[in-house]
A protein has these predicted regions:
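Pyridoxal 5′-phosphate
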Residues: 9, 13
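Serine-dependent protease modules
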Residues: 20-218
């Protein structure tokens, strides 16, 4: 009798899990329809490295050393080595003629921006406009008849709703992750100022390379 009860308990528990799983959303259609309008962004900019006496001293303590023992600032090394720095991010197309959105920090100060589409085509992009406080940048590529995404409104979005992100974390292009809306109306400190755009907080997995990618509600 004891064995029978244990089997009955396990069977009911498994059935309960099956019923709950039927209520989980299916993201396949959204991923298939939306992924073509999501892009991978590679930006390159040049930074300068100052080397002192070829030894790579950049510690302020060496400045204090020269001031104390020689009575003058440490002489600067005229040699400056510049090197390219490459960063990656995501974005999404908002018009068939090549306008797209991303985060400003993905392309800020970039000398060159390359956009990679889902069909493996690549284009050089131009920054049309950017706003550092809201961290949004508008880019343009020379292409036609592109797949697009429509910008939605978050007014009716509720905490606890399912959301999906598509992007290129760690350069793993067009990856889909899901989660829920954790909170609305968040602001992010920006030095002495606070960002004036209310952000959504979500538990969707966001990693380096996801920046600038779209977040979808169902």
């Amino acid at each position: 009798m004891f064995e029978y009860k244990r089997f009955l308990f396990v069977a009911i528990f498994a059935l309960s899990g099956f019923v709950q799983s039927k209520d989980l959303p299916n993201f396949t259609e959204l991923a298939e329809e939306s992924s073509p309008a999501v892009v991978n962004i590679t930006s390159t900019k040049t930074v300068s490295n100052r080397n002192s006496f070829g030894g790579g001293f950049g510690d302020p303590r060496y400045d204090e050393f020269f001031e104390r023992f020689f009575g003058q600032p440490r002489p600067s090394d005229p040699r400056q080595n510049s090197r390219p720095v490459v960063s990656t991010g995501s974005g999404f197309i908002i018009s068939k003629d090549g306008f797209l959105l991303t985060n400003n920090h993905v392309v800020e100060g970039a000398d060159e921006i390359t956009i990679s589409l889902g069909d493996r085509r690549e284009f050089k992009a131009e920054v049309i406009g950017a706003d550092a406080r809201s961290d949004v940048a508008l880019l343009k590529i020379d292409a036609k008849n592109l797949p697009t995404l429509r910008i939605g409104s978050s007014k009716e979005l509720k905490v606890g709703e399912w959301v999906v992100a598509i992007g290129s974390p760690f350069q793993l292009r067009f990856s889909v992750t899901s989660g829920i809306v954790s909170a609305k109306g968040r602001s992010i400190p920006n030095g002495s100022d606070s960002t004036y755009v209310p952000f959504l907080q979500t538990d969707v997995a966001i990693n380096p390379g996801n920046s600038g990618g779209p977040l979808f509600n169902l």
